C-alpha cells in the first residue's frame, strides 16, 4: 500500500570500538527519502561502549527499511576499520611509531576506508601511485640494483617527489643507508631484523615495516 507509516529506529553498538561513518549513513537515509530525520548521538572518531545508542532515525517505514542495510553496512565496515586501527594505535602509544594505511583498499571505497583509518588514530600513506615513488623489488631487479634504480628515478622524477625503497634484507638496507635513501620500507621482515635495521639507521631515515 502507499499509506505512509512513520517509525522510529535506533542504531546501537554491539561491541566496544571507535565510530566512523555517521555522515555517510545520514546521506544514505536522505538519498532514499529527504524527509527522513537522522539524529547522531555521537561523532565520528568517538569511542563507543557496547550497547550504546549511536543514532536515531525517524521517518517513513518503507524508506527506513529500504536504506537501513546499506547504511549499516557502511557504518559497520568503517567502524570496524577504525576500531581495529585504534587497537594498534593504542599498542604503540608510548613509542614514536605510527600506524599507516596502505593503498590495498576495496575498489570504490578507498576514500572512506582511509578516512576510517584516521578516525582510529592512524595516518594515511600514499593515496595513489602518483603521490610518491616506491621502488619495489621488481624495479630493483629490472634496473640491475638499488643504485641503478635510484639513478633512473632521480633523472625522471618530478621535483619534490619523495622516493622510498622497499628492502627485504639487511644488506639492501645498509646499501640504502650508504646511498642516503630517506624513506625505507622493510618488507616482510621479522621483528629481529627490523630491530637490527633500527639500530643501524645511522642517517635517521624514516623506516616503515610492512
Describe the residue ranges of each PLM region.
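Short secondary-structure boundary segments
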Residues: 188
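Short hydrophobic alpha-helical segments of the AMP-binding
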Residues: 201
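Acidic/glycine-rich phosphate/pyrophosphate-binding loops and surrounding catalytic core
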Residues: 1-179, 183, 195-198, 206-208
Amino acid at each position: 500500500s502507499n499509506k505512509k507509516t512513520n517509525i522510529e529506529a535506533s542504531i546501537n553498538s554491539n561491541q566496544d570500538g571507535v565510530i566512523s561513518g555517521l555522515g555517510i549513513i545520514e546521506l544514505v537515509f536522505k538519498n532514499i527519502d529527504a524527509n527522513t530525520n537522522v539524529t547522531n548521538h555521537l561523532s565520528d572518531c568517538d569511542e563507543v561502549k557496547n550497547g550504546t545508542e549511536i543514532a536515531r532515525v525517524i521517518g517513513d517505514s518503507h524508506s527506513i527499511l529500504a536504506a537501513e542495510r546499506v547504511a549499516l553496512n557502511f557504518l559497520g565496515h568503517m567502524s570496524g576499520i577504525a576500531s581495529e586501527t585504534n587497537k594498534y594505535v593504542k599498542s604503540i602509544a608510548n613509542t614514536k611509531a605510527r600506524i599507516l594505511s596502505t593503498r590495498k583498499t576495496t575498489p570504490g571505497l578507498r576514500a572512506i576506508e582511509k578516512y576510517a583509518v584516521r578516525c582510529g588514530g592512524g595516518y594515511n600513506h600514499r593515496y595513489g601511485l602518483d603521490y610518491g615513488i616506491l621502488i619495489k623489488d621488481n624495479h630493483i631487479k629490472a634496473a640491475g640494483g638499488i643504485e641503478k634504480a635510484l639513478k633512473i628515478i632521480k633523472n625522471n622524477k618530478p621535483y619534490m617527489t619523495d622516493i622510498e625503497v622497499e628492502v627485504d634484507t639487511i644488506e639492501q638496507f645498509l646499501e640504502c643507508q650508504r646511498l642516503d635513501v630517506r624513506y625505507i620500507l622493510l618488507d616482510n621482515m621479522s621483528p629481529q631484523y627490523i630491530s637490527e635495521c633500527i639500530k643501524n639507521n645511522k642517517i635517521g631515515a624514516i623506516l616503515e615495516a610492512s
